[in-house]
Amino acid sequence: MGSAYKMLKNDKRCVRKHSKTIFLELFSISSSSSTQDKILQEIENLNADPFVHGIIVQMPLDSHEGIEINSHLVTNRIDPDKDVDSLTTINQGKVATGVLNSFIPCTPAGCLDLIKQSGVKLEGANAVVIGRSKIVGTPVTQLLKWNDATVTTCHSKTQNLKGIVSQADILVVAIGQPQFIPGSWIKTGAVVIDAGINFIPDSYKKSGK
């Protein structure tokens, strides 16, 4: 059984997992050189293509000639039945209300799997999520909540962050800032996941980071 997924990149791949083969066709629609209308039209074409089963828009979207592209409008144009990243309002609403038998955002789902594999008991656990983006922070909070953890979401306006973090049985950091949480804040035995994308100095890499 095969499934086809399309992403806004330039590549073609075939991924085999268990007994299924997933064909990935990645192609480029550069948001820095394409208008918003062109991107929306391409998504409509993919929505109508019966051979495409999933669509992922690679974020963030760049501006075009100084005009910002509305990422919410773009992602919300995807057919919810093909929205494998769960970025449409409909699919986000399902996750928010505990309807988890549809698409779950990949990174939040991966965080939940890692937490379960750690052996920590989710029911009643004190979970702290730092970050509230719709891509990671918010859906992680919702998934933990629907798995019966007691969840606190922290952000840039949160007071007494150290005190909150120090009580966490589970800590998920979903912000783009490295070394934001000192190790001294984290209690012994806590499960910690850094889901942020951070660039830090690395002398072993050609790029230096």
Model-derived features with residue positions:
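Cationic, amphipathic, low-complexity alpha-helical segments enriched
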Residues: 7-8, 15, 21-22, 26-29, ...
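Short, well-structured alpha-helical segments in soluble
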Residues: 38-50
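Short beta->alpha junction loops
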Residues: 24-37, 156-158
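Short glycine-centered, acidic/aromatic-flanked micro-motifs in structured strand/loop junctions
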Residues: 1, 29, 57-59
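Short, high-confidence coil segments that cap the C-terminus of an alpha-helix
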Residues: 51-52, 168
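Short, small-residue-enriched loops and turns at beta-alpha junctions
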Residues: 3-6, 32-34, 62-65, 199
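Anion-binding alpha/beta catalytic cores of soluble intermediary-metabolism enzymes, centered on
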Residues: 53-126
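Glycine-rich phosphate/diphosphate-binding loop of Rossmann-like nucleotide-binding domains
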Residues: 2-17, 93, 99-195, 200-209
